[in-house]
Structure formats: structure tokens, C-alpha cells
Amino acid sequence: MSSMKWLSATAVFAAVLPSVSGFCFPEPKELNFSRVGTSSSTTFTETVGEAGAEYIVSGNASFTKFTNIPTTDTTTPTNSNSSSSNGETASVSEDSDSTTTTPDPKGGGAFYNAHSGVLSFMTRSGTEGSLTLSEIKITGEGGAIFSQGELLFTDLTGLTIQNNLSQLSGGAIFGESTISLSGITKATFSSNSAEVPAPVKKPTEPKAQTASETSGSSSSSGNDSVSSPSSSRAEPAAANLQSHFICATATPAAQTDTETSTPSHKPGSGGAIYAKGDLTIADSQEVLFSINKATKDGGAIFAEKDVSFENITSLKVQTNGAEEKGGAIYAKGDLSIQSSKQSLFNSNYSKQGGGALYVEGDINFQDLEEIRIKYNKAGTFETKKITLPKAQASAGNADAWASSSPQSGSGATTVSNSGDSSSGSDSDTSETVPATAKGGGLYTDKNLSITNITGIIEIANNKATDVGGGAYVKGTLTCENSHRLQFLKNSSDKQGGGIYGEDNITLSNLTGKTLFQENTAKEEGGGLFIKGTDKALTMTGLDSFCLINNTSEKHGGGAFVTKEISQTYTSDVETIPGITPVHGETVITGNKSTGGNGGGVCTKRLALSNLQSISISGNSAAENGGGAHTCPDSFPTADTAEQPAAASAATSTPESAPVVSTALSTPSSSTVSSLTLLAASSQASPATSNKETQDPNADTDLLIDYVVDTTISKNTAKKGGGIYAKKAKMSRIDQLNISENSATEIGGGICCKESLELDALVSLSVTENLVGKEGGGLHAKTVNISNLKSGFSFSNNKANSSSTGVATTASAPAAAAASLQAAAAAVPSSPATPTYSGVVGGAIYGEKVTFSQCSGTCQFSGNQAIDNNPSQSSLNVQGGAIYAKTSLSIGSSDAGTSYIFSGNSVSTGKSQTTGQIAGGAIYSPTVTLNCPATFSNNTASMATPKTSSEDGSSGNSIKDTIGGAIAGTAITLSGVSRFSGNTADLGAAIGTLANANTPSATSGSQNSITEKITLENGSFIFERNQANKRGAIYSPSVSIKGNNITFNQNTSTHDGSAIYFTKDATIESLGSVLFTGNNVTATQASSATSGQNTNTANYGAAIFGDPGTTQSSQTDAILTLLASSGNITFSNNSLQNNQGDTPASKFCSIAGYVKLSLQAAKGKTISFFDCVHTSTKKIGSTQNVYETLDINKEENSNPYTGTIVFSSELHENKSYIPQNAILHNGTLVLKEKTELHVVSFEQKEGSKLIMKPGAVLSNQNIANGALVINGLTIDLSSMGTPQAGEIFSPPELRIVATTSSASGGSGVSSSIPTNPKRISAAAPSGSAATTPTMSENKVFLTGDLTLIDPNGNFYQNPMLGSDLDVPLIKLPTNTSDVQVYDLTLSGDLFPQKGYMGTWTLDSNPQTGKLQARWTFDTYRRWVYIPRDNHFYANSILGSQNSMIVVKQGLINNMLNNARFDDIAYNNFWVSGVGTFLAQQGTPLSEEFSYYSRGTSVAIDAKPRQDFILGAAFSKMVGKTKAIKKMHNYFHKGSEYSYQASVYGGKFLYFLLNKQHGWALPFLIQGVVSYGHIKHDTTTLYPSIHERNKGDWEDLGWLADLRISMDLKEPSKDSSKRITVYGELEYSSIRQKQFTEIDYDPRHFDDCAYRNLSLPVGCAVEGAIMNCNILMYNKLALAYMPSIYRNNPVCKYRVLSSNEAGQVICGVPTRTSARAEYSTQLYLGPFWTLYGNYTIDVGMYTLSQMTSCGARMIF
């Protein structure tokens, strides 16, 4: 069958057109009229000659209402407006009944230019001109204008082209060359159409015809085949038009040049404009393209080359449509919009792609204010698209362009019976090519470039039935230096709801929000999609990149980019030197992936750096990575994901029909290759990544670096609620917040298949994340958190099985695993469902978790792992805060770092579980903490049984909860750790369990980890922890070695409230170790433990050892207490119950099947204020069967000589240790009423056994054993409870007969629990009297029997005031059980005070006691200590010195010679005074020193110029220090001195020769002072812990008279004065009597010291004048003999003994020397500064005195 082709017809003009010379340019033609095609005329169409035409438009010119479209007279009614045309004629067929008028398809109804000349329209300068072309409908190309040459529109005021139609192309304008519009004020192209009429369906299929046959039959075949589309839209039909464009036949006689072959363009394209050359619209104000349409491509514009819009104020392209591509514009070349203000592409549509723009070349948006592409559509949206059989296709539908499926093979707008294409289609009719419908807003086959947009680039509300709802870019997309790039509310039926790209997308230097919001895609990439494994989205210098509320039905709700998404900021300028600036934000929020991975973004690498903030929040994914999916190993392949969907759609719903047509119809070769290459490149991506540049983070698929604020919150997914990655690194972030994310399986916040690294963060917060199985906050194979500057917070994260149903574990039923596999099958790339560890890691899950070098407060609080699943399976619930499958390491070298674990929990809603509930805060097989840490109120719990039948104690498979704070296998803690308020069944604070993840030793691959808890090199506090069964610490092996260790107020139901162990435990103190206030709550054990009988009594033990069945039946658990650098103390550890237990069973420190060893270093103590009540599994009646209790045994050449104390000071202490005790070194102290029961006891030489009154040392009834005492010390600091005839309760050495039924193996069932060990040294052979035999029930007593009275209380007992026999030791009543030899009494036998007497030892024990004879001598109240008494007497010299210093100030300052030269004024003086006196020791006195300081105030007047009179008041505060000859006491004394003085001076002359007038000048100065001095002294006696206090007063007088004679007086030329003087100085100090208080007081009588001195000396004085300031200086030297003095003698009496004596004061020698210096500085007429210094030097004394102050004259 030959194909039919519609051939173009040539219009024949009736009149000959005037010829235009080709050798000259045409004259411009005025265009100032309007034409309306209303009558027969030949002048409607302007025909252009060969040279072209230039039209000068003035006024309003218009061409309207013309058509050459034929109509059928018999079938088509004519319109009243279409009966004639303006000035044109036509040749019409005469047979109106059967013939249809058919024109040649000629174009250019208004202007026709068939030549290459230029056709231009313009206005003259300064005039206005508008051109309107409307309602012109033509069968040919260019409804209004056809131009073979260049077409120009220049400087028109208005250009309106509307309602025009072409039945070929170019509904308004068709240009064979370039088309240019410039300088247009307003250009409007509206309602123009390029519509190819639909062919008429033939009743019968015609045979193939030749060209001539076709010509001959065309008249009969054309009538039924033409149906005007315009008539269906109520446009004029013009059936009877008379025009030269209409001929009688449909087929021309000959073809033109353009018709000899298939046209290069597509008929039905370019609804308004069709340009074969470039189309340029520039320098215009308003340009509007609206409601234009085309049945092929380019609803408004079709250009075979470039399209350019430049410098346009307002460009609006809206409501245009195309049946195929380019709803507004189709450009085969490039499209450029530049230097314009407003550009709008709105509500355009196409059915096959490019709803607004379809460009085969590049698109360039540059230098624009704003450009908006909105509400455009690509595809068919009116009806569901289905593929129909060709026999059913309708060919006569007038609306075929709107309803035909784009999936049809022709690609055109009509479908014929035979499937043939319309004329001009270049598609092969033998192939069916599917419609693409790509790019709802724009489509480009090459690149899209956006530059320098200052307002906004908005691509919004566009739709596409294929990919790229907003835009389709096959090449690169580059956007730079622009403002507000936004893709809003676009949608796609496939990938890329906002934008679909097949090459790299680069965004740089964008301001405002770069926004992808509310875009949707039915496949991948709701907001953005990039095809290809090597294409990336790269962003640099963006203010804000936002993916908000985008949705995809497969992967990448916000964006799908296979290779990489990166955003960073770079700057060449450093705002602050050395600091790289940050700028911009990333916002990924509210995006959804309803059927796949990556709710926010899905990419193989996400790199964000140098940004101000990042927010990934509110995103969701049906599979993995709610916020971001970056894992390359499980990365989904977009095309691979399409194929199963397409295949299934072929047999499913009608909605899938378009996809079926695309996938199963004959595809283009490019489609096939893209599928193949994408799958191949996806598989090859790991190898490619290895060849990348050597970036240290190259293998990191998620990188967030150098960001101020990062938030990942409220995202949801199956895995990785916030982020799903392979390797993730977040570094150098000021604030990182991961909160309120959720995942149904693993990784609520972040999930990484391999590693997660958080480094150099200032603040980290991971809060309120939720997961169904593992890792509420973080989940990774390796988690490394390091170098955090201000700590972090993990709070209220939760792993809760109830959120997902059943978590798969090794013990989970197969049905649960099958359901999970079925869910995973929704994504083909999903791996097989893994076996999960259970509900683990409320905050963090990892195989290896490491925290290092973090500073500040690092907090885990309120995190939970919960199994609330009602299924029958029992899950492991472990690690409320952290679960590390292999190891956890936490370390910090910063002393300010503190890790806090508070309120974390693991729990199950079941009362019985076979799953292991462990680690309220931490679970890991290997735990290493080397940092300060606090664990408080963490819990591991099960639901309370409702009935007794639900109690898991009866079933061996039911497991107890372990480790309220920490659970693991090998746990090591160092630093400072505090555990408080934690709760679990076993190990309320720390518990161990066998590691299920480690292969057993039998596997041969590796050895299992040994269960052990190690606390070392730090301080550890355990307080108020609660164990529902046993132990704040629970482990087979425990090693504690720390500075300060405290177990306080921990509780447990059974023994072992502090520590429960089954193999060995070592506690070594480097500081203080304290077990206090730990409580056991149950009287009887409710169930049997290994090696125990049912209902065994609890003792309230803080430490409990039970080897169970883990060791041989005869082996006890080993406990070693080692006080190496600190003390170990057990006190108030108790059994508290309401059953009225006796005190003997209320307090206990250690119990269980324990082999005990005690070692204390020198000066250190192990104190048991609670009893030790251990048992043993050894059985036998001889002592050598039992273990040895080594006390202070030397180890590794380290001697242990400390003290072991058993005390009943707080409550009764009866300790039972079934071992052979050997005291190797040091001291064992049994305090008052304390009992120690051992199998045997041996005291080695050099050790010390101290027993207080009432103490008992005994063997046990389970075996024969001796008590060998080699030196016993009895502490008499207390009396005990003496019986009649006893001064104190003597200690007892007790022997107990062995019972035949004794069995150590019975443990606590025996009345005396046991745990003995064999003595290491067997009894040597030799004399029975001197060689003890350890297997005998006998007491061996030898060596020194030492009595000590450390407090001196014993000898104050009045019973010692007479002679008597004193029992010292209680012994067995059977003398055969006692052997005493070589015993010597020693110690405190001669007291320093109290009842004095002598002791005589009776070494033969009688009637069960050893006693001594006391003979009374005398009684002494005070301990004697030699004292000297010089201190009190020597204080007199200090009092005298305090008065002399005041006198010296008055003489040298107030009464200075210079003052007598002054004018008579009144003076006020203020002085500061000080003195220091030191005296060496003399034969009569000890050394002492005195210093004092004070103030003096004086006022004086000069009644005459030669006379001064004044008064002064002074106060001194001093201290006296004595350097004693005997150093067993010292004095602390103080002194307060108050003095009042009167002084005066007179200057006179002594007449030597009256006749000659010779006279000597004399100066008389005098001072009288009275002083009252108070003393307060305390004397301390450290050696005897005593003191004295003494308070007394001194009264003093001092009188001084100085007479000076001038040898040289000042003259007019000199101020120098030389003086000799003599002085009389008298002082008297009287010390009042006083009595000491406190220790052995004494009474001292009065004593007095009087001294009269006669200083004689000379002085030199003079003035210095400088800068109007006068300084007057004086220097004096004197010899100072004492002409009278007494030696003060003080008598005293000791009150206790009436002993009397006297003290002679060590006074200075009689001769001494004195030097004085004084100065006065005159600052003016009213102010003077002054000062003086005096030094007295004697043989044994040195006294220095000074004063300085100011004088005011008034």
C-alpha cells in the first residue's frame, strides 16, 4: 500500500503583479491604514518584491479578517463574516453541489515575501506606529506574514498579532531567514495557531496511484477529507471567498522548489512564529505570547536555529500549547534570554516534552531581573493514556490534537487507518516511537546556563508525564552569580519532579534561597534527578540551598544524584587572619520517598563544608535514609528499579499503560543504551572510586565539615532515620543536633554500614531518636567520636521493639524473619534480612565504639532499649545508651572532662525472658573507660510477675537482668567513676556475662574473652545501687586498684550487696577504700545458688564469693585485700529486715565460699567494723586440710607491716574465717568485745597481736587447731565490761573442742561458718614445751606481754589506789590446753600521771586466767614537763621599748631645734610609730624578740616664740616571741599599749660675760609619759597535748630631760648648727601579779624594773633648700650609760605541788650607744612632713625605733 501525502498547492494570482527592479532598493512604504477582508479585492495581501520592502508604520495600521481556507458548500454553513475579502478575487468552482473549493497552501495572508529581500516594519523617529494583524487564516505557512528574506520589526509602538491561523506552520509569521523584533513598546502574539487539518477517513482503501493519477482524481477525493479545525472553534470558514490564493483543484500542476522533497520543518509547528533562521526579540518593553497553539511543535515559537530575547522589560509567554514538543517555544538551536527584567512562561502545555520551552541547543538565562516558568505541562493530562489497536483509531475527530495519545507511533497529532504520517513528518512509518513528554517547564538537549539573575529564577507548578517536571536538561546545568533559584510544586510521572539532568549540575555564588519545594516524582528524585553514575551536583558559595517538602514514589524524595552532591563556600579573603570564613546554609526538610531510599537526598556521596548551617529535618523514606541515603554499596539504580515496575504494569492497572507503552514498545536506541550503561556504571562504581584523587576523605560518602550549626531531626525511615551511609564523617562543627529521628529497624538518627566519625565538634546533641531494633541515635560498624570541645549530650533516645513488631535474633521464629524478608523484597537492591542483636543500643550501636579526647560534660541520659513486643520470642535487650558488639573505648586526657550516664535503661514487658537483659547504660564484650564518669539511675529490668508461677527463678532458661549501668565480658575502668542509684538483678552497677559474639576456645579461631571487671588507677564510688538479687558489682573475677574507692548504701536481696564474684577478687587501695552502709534485704535466700542449700541464711555481706560449679568442688573463691597506699574499711554493712534478727546476724562485711588473704603496707590499715562470715568447701577434722589466711605475708620482696583491725566499736563483731591464720608481719588488732574464730592461729616473730578488753581469739569446732602467740599486746585504753574483781575485761584466747559432725562444706548451715587453709609452716620437731604443734587444740603463749595505755586512762582508775591482783588474759580452764613459757611483762608499766605503782607477773595460768600483782605507790595529777619562766619577765623589756619609741618621736620631731626659729603657731601632729627589739640569750635569760607598731597623735602651741608646750596620745600593738632552750613547748603572746604624754621645750641663753655680752644658747626639752600595757599569752605543750593561758598587765612611767648647748649657731650665710647635749632618761615598768589557767598552773607575784640612763652626745643639723622646699636634717650620736637599774625578780608558785621559785629578768648591759636621725620637710607655710629613726645597741640587745608623719599648722 502506497502512502498518501498532502502536497502544498500554489496560489495563482488573477492579476499580474507589478514588477520590481532587482537593481535598486525599494522605496519605503507608508503603512497607516487598516484592511479588513470583507469583499472581493486583490489588495489585502501585501506582496513583496525581490528587493524586499520597508514599511513605515504610522498611526494604527491593521490587517484583519482574511482567510483562504476552503469550505464545502453542501456541508459547511457559511458565516456571515466570511462572505468576502477586502480587495481580492478568487477562482471558485462552478459546481457548488459537489465540488469543494480547495486553495493552494499559500502563506502570508497580510504580507508575502517570496524573495530573499528584507521585509521590515518600523516607525519614523519621534512618531508612533502600531501594527495589528488579526484573524487571518491561511492554508499555507505564516498566517499573517511569510518572508523568504530577513524579517524585521523595529521601534513600533505596538505590534499586535492575534487570532491568526496557518494550516502548515507559523500561525502568524513564517520566516525562511532571520526574524528580528527590536524597540517594540508592546508586542502581543495571542490566539495564533498552526494547525494541520486531520485527514479524512476513506470508506475503502485506495490503490496505489502515480503522481498523474493523483492529479486526475484529486477533485473527487478532496471533498470529504478537509474539515477545518477553525470551524470547530467558531472561527470564520470563508467558504465563498474570492481570491487569487484559491484554485479549483487540491493538487497543483507542478511543484515548487521547496516541495520537491520533504520540507525541513514540521507542519503544524510555531503557533505564532516559525523561523528557519534566528529569532531575535530585543530592546522592547512588553512582549506577550499567549493562547497560541500548534498541532506539532512550538505552541508560540518554532525556530530552526537560535532564539534570543534581550533587553526586554516584560516578557510573558503564557497559555500556549503544542501537540508535541515545546508548548511555548521550540528551538533547534540555542535559546537565550538576556538583560531583561521580567520574563514569564506561564500555563503553556505540550504533549511530548518541553511544556514551555523545548530547545535542542543550549539555554542561556543571563543578566535578568527575574524569570518565571510556571504552570506549564508536558504530556496528556486530560484522560488516561492507553494504547489502542490501529483499526479502532478515529481519523475524523476534530479535536484529535487534544485527545490523541502521544504514545502513538507517528508522533503527530492525528492517526490514520494505515498509520501514515502527515506531510512533513520525518518519522519512519514502519517504527513506533514513544512520546517522551519530558520537561514540564523546559527541555534542552544540551546545556542550561543561568547567570546574573538579580531577582528570581522560579520554575513552579509545572508537570510532565515523563521525566523532569520542572526542567529537563540533557547537558550540564550551570547557575552562577544569581539570586533565588527556585523549583516549586513541579511534578513528574517519572524521575525528577523539579529538574531532571543527564550531566553535571553546578550552582555557584547564588544569593537568597536556592529552593526546591513541593516537587513530586512518581519515580526517583522528587526535587532533583541527575542521570549517570559519573554526574554530580556541585554547589559553591550559595546563601541557602533548600530541598523542602519534595516527594518521590521511589528513591530520593528531595534529590537523586548517583555520584555526589556537594556544597561548600570558598573565599580568597580572610575576615579574621588564620580563620577560614563560612557562609551559606543547607536545608533538606519535609521531603518524602514513599517507596524507596533517601527521603531527603539519595546519592553516593554527600559533602557539605564551610557552611553556616545545615538542616536535614522532617524527611521520610519507606526504606533507608529518611534524610539522606549515601551508601554506595546498597545504592539503588534508578533504571533497574523501573523495569520490574513496568513489567508488572503490563498486566495490572490502566494507570500503568503509559509506562508499558514506553517500556515494551519499540524503544529508541538511546533508551536502551542508557539502561545498559547506567547499570554497568553502577556496578563499576567501587573500582572507579578507588582511582579518585588522594583526598583523605575520598572514601567517605557522607562528609560534613567546618560548619557552624548542623541539625538532623524528625526524619523517618526503615534504616537510618536521619542518614543512611557507608562511611560518614562530621568534623569541625560548632553545634551538631541529631534529634527526633526514627527508624523501624536500625539507626534512628544515623546508620552507617561501616564507619561513623564525629571529630572536632564544639557541641553535640543526639536526643529523642527512635528505632525498632538497633541504635536509636547512631548505628555503625565503627563509631569514633573524638576531639569534642564542649562535651555532648545523648538523651531520650530509644530502641523499642513495639515500634516495628518483631526484631529478628538468633532465637526469633522463622515467621518473623520471613515477614522482614518480604518487606525488604520491595526494593530489589535490598540485601537479605540480617540477624539483629535484638533491641540494643538506645543511643548508639556499633561493633567498635570509641570516644577519645573529648572535653567538657559528655552526657547520656534517658536513653532506653525496650522490648514491649507481645510475641512469644524473647529478645536480647542490651545497652540502653551504648551497645558495642565487640569493644567500647572511652578515654580523655582532659581533667575537666566528665562522662555522665543518667537514667538510661533496658527493659522488657515480660516477667520471664530467655533473652538477655543487660547493660542499662552500656553493653559491650570489651569495655574500657579511662576518664571521669558518673553512672546514675540506670536500670536493667523486667516486668514484675503477676503470679508466683511467672517468677523465672524456677526455670534454668530464664535469665536475670545484668548490669544496671554497665554489662559486658571484660570491663576496665580507670580515672574517676561514680555509680549511684543503678538497678539490675545481678550487678546493679556493673555486671559481666559470657560473650555470645566471641567464638569459643574450641573453635580454634580465637580464644573467648575472660569475664572480669577491672577498676584501676582512679577513684570509684558505688552508692545507693540496688540489685534485685546480688551485687553492685557482679563478675567471676574482680580487680580493684584505686586511689579512693567507696561502696556506700548499696542494696541487694541476698548477700553481696557491694560485690558478688565467683572466681577471684582483688581489692588494692592506693588511697581510701570504704565499704559502708551496704544492705541486704532478705533474711533467707529464696532459691539455691551454686553450692548453697535452699533457704540459706543471709548475713548482710557487702562482699560475697561463690565459685558455684565453675571450679572444682573443693575450690573456694579467692579474695585478696591489699592496703598498699591507703586504708580499707568495712562498716555498717548490714542485713536489714523486719524479723527481729539478733545483732550477730545483722552486720557482715564478707561472706560466701571464700579463701581470704589480708595485706597492709606500713602505716596502712584494713578495718573490719562488721564481721567476716565466710565458709569453705573443704571438709575434714584436721587443720592442714584447710586453706591459709595469710596476714601481711611478704610478696615480691615487698614487706607488709600494716595493721588489720577487727572491731566491735559500732556493733557486735564475731568473725568466722575457716582458714589457718598466719600473722606474718605487722599488727593484728582485736578491739573490745570482738571475736575472731579461725581454724588455727600462728603469730610469726616480729609481728604484733593487740587485743583490747573483751576481745576473743578462738579456733573453730570443725578441726583441731592451735593458737600460737609470740608476743601479745593488751590495749588498756578502755576497760570493757569488767566482772567482779576485775579492773578491765581481759581478752580471751579460746580453744573449742572439735565436733565429730563438723563439716566445712556445709557452709552457712554450720553454726560456725568456715573457710580454712593449710598452714604453710609445719610444726617442727623438738621440745613440746617450746615448739608448738599446730594440729593441737592448745594455746601457746610466749614472748612479751605488753600493756599499753595510749590515752593515759587506765592509771586514772581509783581501784589502782591499793594493792591487788589483776587478771590480764582469759585462757582455757583446762591447763593441758595452755602452755605459757618465756613470757615477759612490758609496756606502759610506769605512768607519768595518775596512780603510780609496780607490776609483778604471775606466769603460771590458774583457773583459766593469767594475772599480775599491782603494788600502789603514789598519785600524780599532771604529767611533769620541765619549764622555764623567763618569758613573763622578759615581756617587761618590750613594754619599756614601746614607751621609749613614743618619747623619741616627741623629742626629735615635736621639740626639734628648728622649730624654735618658726613663728609662733599651733600644730597638729599625726605619726606612725614602730619598734623592734631583739635580745640574745644570756646566762640569766633565753633569747627573745619583740616588735610593735602603732599610731601617735599630738597637739602643741608656742605661747612665745622660744617656748613650746604640747600633749600626745599613743596606741601600740606588739608581740613577743621566745626562743626556748627547751623545745617541748612554745609561747604565743600579744601586747596592747596605751600611752599619754606631756612635752615642752624652752630656748634660752646663759650669760657668760655681761660686760662683753658673751652668752651660750641652751635648749631645754622634756617629756613625761604614762603607759598601760596588757598582755595575753598562750603556752602550748605538744608532747603532752596540754596548754597554759596567762593574762596580766604592766604599768609604766617614763621621764626624759634633754639640755643642748650650741657650739655653732646658724648665720646669715649658713644654716649649720653644732650642738652638744646631755640627757636624763628614767623609766619604770611594774608587772602585776597573775595566775595561769589549764595545765599545771602557776601563780606569779608582782615585779618591777626601773632604769636611769644618762645619754651624752653631740648633734649636727642644717637646712637644704631646693625648688622652694626646705628640708631640715639632724644627726646625733650619744653614749648611754645606765647609772641606776634594778634586776627584776619575779616569784612564782606551782599550785598543784606548792613548789616555789623565782625568775630573774635578763636585762640589757649597763652601757650602750644610741644614734638618731630626724628630718623635716617644709612643703609650705602650713604643711610639714617629718620622720626620725633611732637605734640602740648594747652587748646583747638591739633596739630599732622609727616614726614618721605630718604636721599641720593652724
Curated annotation (Swiss-Prot):
Residues 1-14 form the signal peptide. Residues 1461-1754 form the Autotransporter domain. Residues 68-105, 212-232, 413-427, 636-668, 1299-1311, 1320-1332 have a biased composition (Low complexity). One of its GO terms (cellular component) is extracellular region. Residues 68-109, 190-235, 252-271, 397-438, 621-668, 1299-1332 are annotated as: Disordered. It is a peripheral membrane protein. Residues 252-264, 402-412 have a biased composition (Polar residues). The keyword Signal applies. InterPro entries: Autotransporte_beta (IPR005546), Autotransporte_beta_dom_sf (IPR036709), PbH1 (IPR006626), Polymorphic_membr_middle (IPR011427), POMP_repeat (IPR003368), WDR48 (IPR051246). Keywords: Cell outer membrane, Cell wall, Membrane, Secreted, Signal, Transmembrane, Transmembrane beta strand. One of its GO terms (biological process) is double-strand break repair via homologous recombination. It is found in: Secreted, Cell wall; Cell outer membrane. GO terms for molecular function: ubiquitin binding. It comes from the Bacteria. Its main location: secreted. Belongs to the PMP outer membrane protein family. PANTHER family: WD REPEAT-CONTAINING PROTEIN 48 (PTHR19862:SF14). This is Probable outer membrane protein PmpB. It comes from Chlamydia trachomatis serovar D (strain ATCC VR-885 / DSM 19411 / UW-3/Cx). The gene is pmpB.
